[in-house]
Amino acid sequence: MLYPRNLALFSLLSLSSAAPSQVERSPDAVLKPRAVCTPTAGGSPSIDDVPAIRKAIASCGNGGTIVFPAGSTYYLNSVLDLAGCSNCDIQVEGVLKFSGSTEYWGGKTAMLNIDMINGLRLRSLTGSGVIDGNGQNAYDRFASDKNYKRPTLLYITGGSNIEVSGLRQKNPPNVFNSVKGDTQHVTFKNLRMDATSNSQNPPKNTDGFDIGASTHVTISSVSVTNDDDCVAFKPGSNYVTVEDVTCTGSHGISVGSLGKSGTDVVQNILAHRINMIESTKAAGIKTYPSGNGHGLSTVKNVTFSDFNVRGCDYAFQIESCYGESESYCESNPGNAILQGIVVKGFSGTTSGKYDPVVANLNCGARGTCDVSMSAFSVKAPSGKATVLCDNTPSSLGVSCTSGASG
């Protein structure tokens, strides 16, 4: 029904456009709906749902959407390779649960593999989606067999424009997320990650993020509970931002380890607005010393800022003798090049394990130690705040006491 005002407007438009031109819409200008596939779940741990998921990727992986509905559980008894996804959207609202078979997974690199894919969103829109690495058997086996090789839960190699968001990741056998192979533009956001053991054997080596050769990686609004580095910047990481992250029980935000056998570079890193709880350190740099086939480590333009330290053993640590004994490093001092390392805005209280020491900066005698610290107010439980230093610059920014190690 046309109301008077609308009728008048309609009449005016009719008079002013007595000979309207036809506007033809190009078929290419019409957005085609995305194909949507929902894999059929087998409904039993004895049925591997990976083939059904691969079939869905074959049908909908090129620009389409693959949905794992809320309330569903998919049992993954083999590696899930997302090859064939290009500009695709994988929406996990149910549970993807990997098998706990230590026989099958032994020696595998990845459980969920993203290799040379350009354009992929792996996400939960509701926050209910879970990727379960089912790692308890691996924790128990590794406790008695240190040679047992465990897979990474989510492994990204090469490719670009990848987003992982809104999910819970739990109990990986080894590392949660790995990025390498010159991958570009990866975003991790709004993730809940926890590795917990129900036996006396801890979930060893469960790094939250291992960021290797890659550029423009962002990690934001993430919580991690684990038993190794919360975030580790490995050789080749460049332009990485970590922000608004909470880490519990970890080894902190770490550069390294670097220089074990080759020339390693980490550069252009920003880690800020971090809550670090009951970790061995809040932030730090780990480099191998010189000699014995070790290489050269270069760490440039790295900023650690606005860290809230709660019960961590150290607030900040530089290790230039990583992987070797103190006596070895007396003969083969560290030679790492540290340039433009900024530590600022650290507050809170350490665990007291090294009370009154709150930071330990052991720069290599044969290296470069361009490090500055400011607004550093972390204290030990005693109320004291000793910073141990060796080979640090006079312009460091905090009062130093000799005797650093590591």
Swiss-Prot record:
Q: Name one GO cellular component term.
A: extracellular region
Q: Which residues are glycosylated?
A: N301
Alphabetized UniProt keyword annotations: Carbohydrate metabolism, Cell wall biogenesis/degradation, Glycoprotein, Glycosidase, Hydrolase, Polysaccharide degradation, Repeat, Secreted, Signal
Q: Which Pfam families match?
A: Glyco_hydro_28
GO process annotations (BP): cell wall organization; pectin catabolic process
Main localization (coarse): secreted
What SMART domains is this protein classified in?
A: PbH1 (SM00710)
Q: Give the family this protein belongs to, as stated in its UniProt record.
A: Belongs to the glycosyl hydrolase 28 family.
The name this protein carries in UniProt is Probable endo-xylogalacturonan hydrolase A
Origin species: Aspergillus fumigatus (strain CBS 144.89 / FGSC A1163 / CEA10) (Neosartorya fumigata)
What taxonomic classification does the UniProt entry list for its organism? Answer: Eukaryota, Fungi, Dikarya, Ascomycota, Pezizomycotina
Question: Could you tell me the gene encoding this protein?
Answer: xghA
